Structures are given as structure tokens and as C-alpha cells.
Amino acid sequence: MAITDIKKKPTLKSNGSAVVKKTTTTSIAAAPKKSTLTEKPKQIVKKVIKKQEEKEVKEEEEEEVKEEIKKEIKKEIKNEELDEDSLLEKEEEEKEIEEFINNTNQKKSEEEEKKYENVTFESLGVHPQIIDACNKLGFNKPKEIQRESIPWALKGRDIIGLAQTGSGKTAAFVIPVLQKLLEAPQGLFCLALAPTRELAYQIADQFNAIGSTIGVKTCVLVGGIDSMSQSLALAKKPHVVVGSPGRVLHHLEHTKGFNLRSIKYFIMDEADRLFSADFEEEVNNILKVIPKERNTYLFSATMTSKVAKLQRASLVNPVKVQVASKYQTVDTLLQQYLFVPFKYKDCYLAYILNELAGNLTIIFTSTCASSTKIAMMLRNLGFGAIPINGDMDQGKRLASLNKFKQGTKSILVATDVAARGLDIPSVDLVINYDVPTNSKEYVHRVGRTARAGNSGRAITIVTQYDVEMYQRIEFVLKKKLDSFPCQEETVLIFLERVQEAHRIATNELKDKNYSSSSDRHSGDSEGSIDINKRKVIKKVHKKKKY
């Protein structure tokens, strides 16, 4: 006959104190030997937490801490024979310890928030005139990247800034530059480089907005605009010059009287992109003609780890301000994927847009022709879509962007020209029609939504040919994405209409002298990968159109 014993087992609360639970166990004779593990979880946790505090473990190292705890537990139970009940107890204790660590880290983050609760632009040392401009723009409190970088910048240090997209990076370098300009005004005070035309205009807009109270003058130097009008603007000695490397170098070589020998500040926004082969020659030539006695700021959402590349920018004792891991997306972003058959890719795109109608959406494609064709196809289906890509002249690109910002068109079909730096806070949805070829581009693409604390959604369409690239992205992000729910039967209801819209778009493109053979439409990602591989083998670096 079985004997029922009432045993008391200590468990761990989130605050670290032990409570007693009553558990009922059944045995044939005497109770089995109780695992010594049950008496030690609290001591183990305390020991590891102490190590955590000593090492000042950061948020991204939480997993390492948890692994350390598990190793400690394994040491405790080594050479010990555990029965089924003891194994269950061990699992429960591991869960309790993990919960304890999570609660501890949560408390630490809450304490940090309280610590920075009273931090203001004034306490950071920002000039009252600039604070007034920030308040008018709704910048009432400094963001994390601004809190960390502005004090160092005002002390005259070079800065490498790494922060998530939409976290206020632009203002983090604009504010200190304007403050130093206010203290010692001069023409051609600052040069800011950006990899795309749209980002250059956005940086200039930020300088104009925050510098409105001090009368700052800016000049934008990008391709697609008449260089003569830019030369006339340079002749007026603007305080800040913002441009793409190619056009800045063009004016250095061809505009009489223009030089950068007097600049005090040199900024590279989206610095990792500017260090790539596409801009290497131009950036190196610009670095040769600017003074060594200057302050340099490098900012990006993803940053190269190659020290040699950073050294080319001639940084002097730089401060690294990092408020995000190398490849990190914001917590307010819902990231999903949709695995689809290659031949039904367009049909699934139409289904997603129909299901999530009413959202301001950016669709990313891998080629310019694909961007134009998909926009045409979606318009034929009744969606308000407009393209933006490197094949369009600057006037048309800005017109597309303005229509999208104003809400006249709700869908922007873009190449990676729109992936970096564009700040449109109201974007609700990002769709990766073509899987990005690397994790950096994924981070920048999905960073167009969920900006400045807002929520957003990103959906990546994955075909059978994209699985390896997609898995690589998940591996680097250290995150498994959820699947976007849908039924194929429901999706295929759109098939006939989508095929007809695609046929009409193809004919329209032929009329505009687009070569369909160079596009392959849905196969863009495959084709572009093969082309890129051949380019690497031949070591021929053709510049992308930005």
C-alpha cells in the first residue's frame, strides 16, 4: 500500500526571498533521497548576480549570464543520481532562476530610466537659443543617443555613434555643431556627407530647423540638380555644406573659389555605407583636402567593425557611443515573414496590401525596373502606389517622396535608395518584396517604420530561392521571426486580377524602353545576386545610382 508524505519545498520569489510550497509525493517505501540542488538555488543566484554586478553586464549579455547560471546548476548536480521528481524540481528551479534574472534586469532598466528622467537639454549644456528651437520642433527631452553623445561633443571629442534607426541620431550631431557655430561663427564651418540624395536633404532640413533661431545657412550638393545653381549657393559661403561624396568632389575640382580648408566639423551619416566600395575613392579624396585639425563625427544604425576603415577618417581619440547592438531593431517593431511559392509572389503582395489596407507602406525591391513595374502593377489593381529609385531624376524622386509624406499616395515602392536615413514617422508597414542581401540592409529597411517610439510592422516575403539569405538575417539578428498568417486558397482569389495587372505593367514598361530581360520581375533578387557575384569575382565596382 502506498504511503503519502507531505514535503515542504523552498521556491524562489522574484525578489530573491524563499517561500514554502506544499507538495504531495507518493512512494512505495521510504521517500527517495532529496536532491541537494533544492537547497541551493538561492545561493547560486546570489553568486551569479554578484558576478553580474561586478562585470557590469550589459543588456545584450543577458544570455551569457543565464548560461553561466545553468553551468553553476550543472556543477551542483554533477555525479548525483536524480530520480524523476528531482529532475522536475531542477526544471522548476531553472525557470525560477531565469525569472529572477529577468526581473533583476528589468529593475535595473527601470532604475536607469529614473536616473535619466530629469535630464534635459539645459543640463547637457545646450545653448538656450538652440533649446528654444528644439522645443518648437517638439524635442522636449533628449533621446538616449543625444544624452550620451552631446556632452562629449561639446567637450570637443570625436564621436562614433551607433544607435537604432529613428532614435534621434541626426539631432545628436546637429545640436553640438550649431552650438559651436554660435560660439565662433564662420562660413564653411561644417561638411556633412550622406550616401543618398534624400538623406542629404533631410540632414540639411534638420540643420535649418534647429538652427532657425541663429540664422544658419545651408547648401545641399547632390546629383540630379544643376551644378551652376549649387556653385552660386557655395559662393555665398554657407555655414553648413551637406552632400553626396561624388557631387562634393565635383565642386572641389570644378567650382572656382570653393575649398574645405577652413571647416571645423566633418560628419559622416550612415558612415558604414560611406566606407563601402561605392564611395571609397570619393571619400578618400575628400579626406585629403580637409584640415586635420577638426572634429569628426561618424553615425550609423550599423557600423563597420574594421578598424582600418575607421582610421581612414582620421579620428583623434574618439568616444564610442553605443546605445544599440551592431544589428538591432527596436522593440516596438513587429517583424514577420511570409514563405510563398516563387510564381505567386505578386499575388501574395496584393493579398498583404489588401489585408492591411489603410496603412502608409514602403515596399522594398532589389532593382530600379522592379520598383517601377510593381508600382505600375499596384496602380492597375487600384492601390495608390508610386516608385522611387535611382533611375529617376532628382525632381521626380523628391516629388514621389513628398506625395508619400503628404499622404497623397499611400504606397512607396522603393529600392535601397530609401532604406537609409529617411525619417517619415507615420510609416506603418514595411514590406521586403525582395529579401535584402545582407543583415545591415535589413536593419535599415525595417527601420523606416516604428520610429521615435511609435509601433510598426515589417513583413519579409521569402520564396524557395531566398531561404539561405533569410536564415542568415535571422542568425545575425539572433531572433526567430513569426509567420504572417494567411491561407493560400484565400490568396489565390487575387491571382487572375494580379496576372492581368502584371501583363499591363509589363507592356507599359516596354513602351518606356525598359528591358524586361534585365529585370525578370519577381526574380530580381536571384538575378541581382548572380550579377553581384560576377562583379566581385571580376573586382569591378560600379557605382550604384543614388
From Swiss-Prot:
Q: Where is the Helicase ATP-binding domain?
A: 150-321
Specify the enzyme's EC class, one word: hydrolase
Q: For this UniProt entry, what is the primary localization, expressed as one broad class?
A: nucleus
Composition bias of kind Basic and acidic residues appears in 512-524
Q: Where is the composition biased (Polar residues)?
A: 12-21
Where the record annotates domain Helicase C-terminal, the positions are: 348-492
Q: Which reaction does it catalyse?
A: ATP + H2O = ADP + phosphate + H(+)
For the keyword DNA damage, the answer is: no
Q: Where is this motif: Q motif?
A: 119-147
Q: Which SMART domains match?
A: DEXDc (SM00487), HELICc (SM00490)
Which stretches are transmembrane? Answer: none
Q: What is its EC number?
A: 3.6.4.13
Respond yes or no to whether keyword Nucleus is given for this record.
Answer: yes
Residues holding ATP: A163, Q164, T165, G166, S167, G168, K169, T170
Q: Which GO terms describe its molecular function?
A: ATP binding; ATP hydrolysis activity; RNA binding; RNA helicase activity
What does the UniProt entry say about where the protein is found?
Nucleus, Nucleolus
Any idea what job this protein has? Probable ATP-dependent RNA helicase which may be involved in ribosome biogenesis.
Q: Write the protein's name.
A: Probable ATP-dependent RNA helicase ddx47
